[in-house]
Amino acid sequence: MLHILMRSPFETNMVLLMNMLESVDDILMLQNSVVLALKNNVFLNKILSYSVSMYALKQDLCARGILDNISPNVNVIGYNRFVDLTVKHKQQMSW
């Protein structure tokens, strides 16, 4: 499943998200949710323990001035890869 996050982790039910995660899932961070990608983020470290792949949209990272401060465990992607992820996952959930 592709989990598409759009809001800050402080505005999202992160416990519910983590309870739903499976190792084959991907997480895509857009809009304000990209703050989740910051190094040493408590939520990020917990999510990484589920062995899911994490992606953040470069344009949203740049718009918030945090591109240079994100975790090396987060894949920075553009719109083409965003589309690839939506094609890869038939099931998607927006948070």
Curated annotation (Swiss-Prot):
Keywords: Cytoplasm, tRNA processing. Belongs to the DsrH/TusB family. This is Protein TusB. Gene3D superfamilies: DsrEFH-like (3.40.1260.10). GO terms for biological process: tRNA wobble position uridine thiolation. GO terms for cellular component: sulfurtransferase complex. SUPFAM superfamilies: DsrEFH-like. It comes from the Bacteria. The lineage of its organism: Bacteria, Pseudomonadati, Pseudomonadota, Gammaproteobacteria, Enterobacterales. InterPro entries: DsrEFH-like, Sulphur_relay_TusB, Sulphur_relay_TusB/DsrH. Heterohexamer, formed by a dimer of trimers. The hexameric TusBCD complex contains 2 copies each of TusB, TusC and TusD. The TusBCD complex interacts with TusE. It is found in: Cytoplasm. It holds the Pfam family DsrH. Part of a sulfur-relay system required for 2-thiolation of 5-methylaminomethyl-2-thiouridine (mnm(5)s(2)U) at tRNA wobble positions. The keyword tRNA processing applies. Its main location: cytoplasm. The keyword Cytoplasm applies.
